[in-house]
A protein has these predicted regions:
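Short, charge-rich amphipathic interface segments used for partner binding and complex assembly
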Residues: 32-64
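N-terminal acidic leader/helix
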Residues: 1-34, 60-64
Length: 65
């Protein structure tokens, strides 16, 4: 399932290349997050805490543009 990407005004992004880049970035992010969760669980860290820390980190991030 592909995400319907929107701009700040809520208009759908229609550029195929932009959508492709965003979808690829999300796939890469999912893979990295899965690695973090798997590594943490294998080392005995609570899965819920890992997810909470990832969300905290995300909440601190803003666009550099």
């Amino acid at each position: 399932m592909s995400i319907l990407w929107r701009n700040d005004n809520g208009t759908l992004i229609s550029c195929v290349e932009k959508i492709k880049v965003m979808d690829q970035n999300m796939a890469e992010l999912k893979s990295v997050i899965q690695d973090i969760i798997d590594d943490g669980v294998l080392m005995g860290v609570a899965e819920q805490q890992i997810k909470e820390e990832i969300l905290k980190l995300l909440a601190t991030m803003t666009s550099q543009y």
